[in-house]
Amino acid sequence: MKYAAPAAFRAALEARLNATARAGGRPIGHARKLVAFTRLLARLERAAPDRWVLKGGFALELRVPGQARTTRDVDIDWDTSLDDAATALVEAAALDLGDHFAFDIRRVGDADIGSAGGGVRFHADAYVAGRLFESLLIDVGVGGELLSPPDELTAPDLLDFAEIAPAHVRAIALEQHIAEKVHAYTRRHGDDQPSSRAKDLIDIVLMSELASFDFDRLREAIVRVFEERATHEVPTALPAPPLDWARPYRALAEEVGLDPNPAAGHRLAAAFLDRVVAGDTDARQWDASTAEWRR
C-alpha cells in the first residue's frame, strides 16, 4: 500500500475513480461498486478459498471489464451450507488486508439465485477512512452443481496507483453461465407470466461475443442446468422478449453499447442459441467474429 494515511488514500481513490468514469463514459457509481465488490471478494477469497464461485452479472463484469451492465449485487454459490457462508462472510469482512477498506455485513433476507439449496441476501457497507464509501448486496446460494472446472477471473486493476494487486476469483465456467442465463430468461413466474429480467437478454448477447463455443459443451450445460432446476423444459427456440421490455432493455443496451431495440437483441441471441436448444447436430462451433455456427 502506497498510502499510509487512510484519508490520503481516499482522496487519491476518489480522483482515480472520477477519471475512470470520465474516460469510460460510465457513471461514477459503477466504478465505486466495482472497487468495493472486488475488495470484499478479495477478503472472501482469503478467508474461504475454494469454497465458493462467482456467478451472475458481476462475473460477466469481470469477463468484460467496462463493457457489462452495472450490477447492484454479487451472486455467489457456496459449497456447503448457508450458515457456513454467513460465518465466512462475517469473518471475511473483518479481515484487514492493508488496503484501508473496512466492511460491515449483515443478513437481510432470502434470495433466489437459482441454487437448489436456497439462498440468502446480505447487505454490506464499505468504509474508507472511517466514512461510508459504498453499500453492496451479496446474494449467496448453496446446492448448485459445478458442471465443469471454474474459470479464474481477475478484477480490473483500478488500485494500481496505490500498489494494491487486483483480486483473483473463481467463477462458474462460461458455458454454465450462459446456460443459467437461458434458464432465467425462459422461466415463467406466478400465473404463467414471462420473466421481467431484461438484463438476461443483454447478458446473453454480450456472452455470445466472448468466445468460440463448442456446440456439445454448450448444449450439455443447458440440458444439465434445466434438469437440475426442474422448473420447465428446454425450449425448442429462444422466445421473443415481452413487449413491456422496451424501456428497461433500452436503458441497459445503451449503457453497454448494444442496439437499444429488444428485437435486435433477440435476433442476436436466437442466432446464437436456437440451434443449440433445438439440438441441431449440424452445428459444431460458434464463430463469435461472424456470429454464426459452423460445421
Segments (PLM) and residue ranges:
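Structured mid-to-C-terminal alpha-helical surface segments
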Residues: M1-W52, L62-V74, W78-R295
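Catalytic metal-binding/acid-base residues of hydrolase active sites
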Residues: A59
